[in-house]
């Protein structure tokens, strides 16, 4: 790692030259989600004073979105703290008395029904019949046994055979089907039910991975994702409380809301020794202003453009303001990178990083909350799971647009009713979730009601009094829910995505110009809130280490 206090030819080091003039490195963080806030807070706590966070939307939190309706908080985004042992999100929430335990540390059968440890999942068929409890338990034991086998390919280096196509879904479907068909104790009718249940479980798995289909998730890389031991927890007051606690260590003027970025111009000093390729429109200190978010323009060493000492990075905002910086930490989602990497970076990203962006996957998992006047489900029921009997032999989890509702795997009962009222939370993912997002509330409520009537066999279920749903796929600032290792990708691609720019170290090139964080950049904890937070702290630590000598010397 190149140090800002390097000896020898440090006079020619663009980073050292800039620091002699400015005194403090300027860091711009793009995104005020968990990763961006964690990075900014860590830098500020270690003595960095010229830090700016640019958030495209009107609020902080990123993919944490707690919506308050009356006295109740609903989570459109992150919902659970997954595991407690060493989980920094858990530690922050626990220290502030925010937690409520929802499951024990074991992998639950429904695995997405984490609102309550109590009750049972009701597996219902499209003919309006409930699958017997013993059949559900037998199938769940078999499925979980095969699921554990999917972990062994990465963890034990087992070779993947060609028949599986290196796909979690293909492997699981085939293994479970063969075991069901070969079972001499089951009747043909029971076998048909269990075969149909495979697709329902794989829909749940697809929602959990936020893939269009679990068939697209890499079998050889699947076991690298690591589950933190301990119980799952929810935060009754809203997951946004964690975001707010994280932001408490950041002065308000550091965060600029409604500030989308158009382009990051990096490697400016080496490419243009006399100045940037675009003209600055914003002068003034972007951190040490009046404390009210304005620009004082009183400190030319920190805030004004200096063509004799060009900045390594220039952030061009959509409102045409241009912010020069020594370092930029990019926390945008993988979905945004996939959509915008060609225009978001100048010069273009290295081929290796572009390839990693292409290979890694991100999809959409959406929630549909339905509120009813009275419950039509029993007090022992914690979820309603939909099993289509005509999918017993199906080999796909893709449906035509007019059948998008078939991707809804089921509805969880929000618990306790004293807090939530009588509310169901449905799950849908993939391209079908995008179709759902394009429908209006009335249409979605109507279709969900018809499904509930069909699967429960109760034609008298009323329409919900209220509907609330997420739309992560069509949101231009996210373009998806969270990442996964797609077939053809591996943890090595996560490392490539996280690698700072520029790749080469030179006395002529400022180091660590563009850094990358966010859940998709954490090799073990991608897709999680703790992975996002840890990735932000990781990138901050790179800069803290780089400037260690500077801050140890003091003023």
UniProtKB/Swiss-Prot annotation:
Biological-process GO terms, alphabetical: spermine catabolic process
GO molecular function, one term: spermine oxidase activity
Induction: By antitumor polyamine analogs.
Keywords (A to Z) from UniProt: Cytoplasm, FAD, Flavoprotein, Nucleus, Oxidoreductase
GO cellular component: cytosol; nuclear membrane; nucleoplasm
Tissue: Widely expressed. Isoform 1 and isoform 2 are expressed at higher level in brain and skeletal muscle. Isoform 7 is found in brain and spleen, isoform 10 is widely expressed but found at lower level in heart, kidney, liver and lung.
Co-factor note (free text): Binds 1 FAD per subunit.
Matches recorded under SUPFAM superfamilies: FAD-linked reductases, C-terminal domain (SSF54373), FAD/NAD(P)-binding domain (SSF51905)
Cofactor (UniProt): FAD
Residues where FAD binds: 35, 55, 63, 79-80, 261, 519, 528-529
Swiss-Prot/TrEMBL catalytic activity: spermine + O2 + H2O = 3-aminopropanal + spermidine + H2O2
Sequence segments annotated as region (Disordered): 271-307
Compartments (UniProt record): Cytoplasm
Annotated pathway: Amine and polyamine degradation; spermine degradation
Main localization (coarse): cytoplasm
Stated role: Flavoenzyme which catalyzes the oxidation of spermine to spermidine. Can also use N(1)-acetylspermine and spermidine as substrates, with different affinity depending on the isoform (isozyme) and on the experimental conditions. Plays an important role in the regulation of polyamine intracellular concentration and has the potential to act as a determinant of cellular sensitivity to the antitumor polyamine analogs. May contribute to beta-alanine production via aldehyde dehydrogenase conversion of 3-amino-propanal.
PANTHER family for this protein: FLAVIN MONOAMINE OXIDASE, SPERMINE OXIDASE
Similarity comment: Belongs to the flavin monoamine oxidase family.
Protein name as catalogued: Spermine oxidase
Protein species of origin: Mus musculus (Mouse)
Taxonomic lineage: Eukaryota, Metazoa, Chordata, Craniata, Vertebrata
